[in-house]
Each structure stands twice: as C-alpha cells, then as structure tokens.
C-alpha cells in the first residue's frame, strides 16, 4: 500500500477553493506515488469532478442508518453516490458520539462500499495518567468492525491543533497496540501534522500514512508535505 495522506478540511473551504485545489493536485499527481484523500465539507463533495487515479475524495462523517428521520445527517450511500470512497469516523471534534455508534457507522460505511478511517486516541488526562495504551486498546475493541477493510487513525486528542506531537517511539508503541488488535491493519497518525514535522513522522516504524488538518488547506504547503513524504519513501 502507498503512503496514505489524508486531508481533513473540517469546516473550512468553499466549493470553488476545493475545485481549484483538486485542479492543481491533478496537475501534480504524475509526480506523486502516495495515495491522497481529500475530505472537504459536505457542500464541496465532488459529484462529477475529474480525479486522477491516486486522488480520492472522502467525507468527515456519516450516519449509521441508511435513511430515516435524522435531520442534518447524511448516509454512507449518499456519500458513495457523490463519489466518495473514504469517510473519517469517530473524530474527537464530533462530541457526544459513543464507541458503539462509531462502530455502527464503520460497519454501515463498509457495507455501502466506503473505506472508513476510524479515529482513536487518548486525551491529556489519560496521557498524564500513563493510560494511553489502555485507552486506545479499549477504543479498538469498542469501535473497530470485525469484518471489512478500514484504516485506523491514531490521533491523540491533546495533540490536535496544539502543535505538540508525541515522540516517534510513543507513536510506534501505540501503532503496535492497534495492530495487535486489528491483525496488522493500516495505521496512520493525526494530530498537529505539519511541514515542519512530516519528515520526522515519516520515519516511524509501521506508520502507513498521516491525517492532516489545517496544514492541508493551503495547496502549496500541502504539496510540500507530500513532497517530503515522497523523499522519505
């Protein structure tokens, strides 16, 4: 599997910004071997936009039901129809979601033909209490589906948007915990990934990719991150 680079735009960016971004990415894709997944807001999801083969589109959430009276929600089947192939699930910024709901969403996404990127990670209190491995293992047991293909994103809550990143050894240890439960599924890292630290992160043992937040909104900065990954691989 190629190194997976996922851009989570969160609630940022307009449709015109997205179209312009994808156009530039298509122009550069021949020089890129990594797998790129861009996850814009729902309003920018592509429809019939042209994509080169190593670029995919993802969403930032889906409901675990296929249809029904769920105001403001969107189903996995709807995302698939819009051209999505990936969906981020269980991100810590989506508050009040239970582990059980995240697992149901993951199972529904797989049934609908999407590849879920399922987030796990400890908060600051867990980290300071040396409970990181315990928390992540419990989340794996509670959130991850038994069958189907998916990717796990280790994204420590305390690292998101703070500029702080765990050591390479600490990340590698958590990857080992996740893979011991998931039969060697692919694990990516998210949490303050930037141009300044991507070269270092690329050296982590068994890391299959990265989940990038705000650093993915500017095309030139994102492209430089991709270039750094290409050098490492």
Curated annotation (Swiss-Prot):
Its main location: cytoplasm. It catalyses: D-glyceraldehyde 3-phosphate = dihydroxyacetone phosphate. Disulfide bonds: none annotated. InterPro entries: Aldolase_TIM, TIM_sf, TrioseP_Isoase_bac/euk, Triosephosphate_isomerase, Triosephosphate_isomerase_AS. It comes from the Bacteria. The keyword Cytoplasm applies. It is found in: Cytoplasm. Keywords: Cytoplasm, Gluconeogenesis, Glycolysis, Isomerase. GO terms for molecular function: triose-phosphate isomerase activity. Substrate binds at residues 8-10, 161, 192. The active site is at 91 (electrophile), 155 (proton acceptor). Belongs to the triosephosphate isomerase family. This is Triosephosphate isomerase. It comes from Wolbachia sp. subsp. Brugia malayi (strain TRS).
């Amino acid at each position: 599997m190629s190194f997976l680079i996922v851009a989570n735009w969160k609630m940022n960016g307009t449709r015109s910004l997205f179209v312009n971004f994808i156009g530039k990415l298509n122009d550069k894709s021949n020089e890129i071997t990594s797998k790129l997944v861009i996850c814009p807001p729902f309003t920018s999801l592509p429809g019939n936009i042209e994509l080169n083969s190593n670029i995919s589109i993802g969403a930032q959430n889906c409901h675990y039901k296929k249809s029904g009276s769920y105001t403001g929600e969107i189903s996995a089947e709807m995302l698939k129809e819009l051209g999505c192939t990936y969906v981020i699930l269980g991100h810590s910024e989506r508050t009040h979601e239970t582990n059980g709901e995240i697992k149901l969403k993951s199972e529904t996404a797989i049934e609908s033909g999407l590849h879920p990127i399922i987030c796990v990670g400890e908060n600051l209190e867990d980290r300071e209490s040396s409970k990181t491995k315990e928390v992540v293992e419990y989340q794996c047991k509670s959130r991850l589906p038994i069958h189907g293909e998916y990717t796990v994103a280790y994204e420590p809550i305390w690292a998101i948007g703070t500029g702080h990143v765990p050591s390479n050894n600490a990340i590698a240890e958590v990857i080992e915990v996740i893979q011991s439960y998931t039969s060697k599924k692919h694990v990516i890292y998210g949490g303050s990934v930037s141009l300044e630290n991507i070269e270092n992160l690329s050296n982590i043992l068994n890391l299959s990719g990265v989940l990038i937040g705000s650093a993915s909104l500017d095309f030139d900065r994102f492209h430089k991150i991709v270039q750094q990954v290409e050098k490492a691989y």
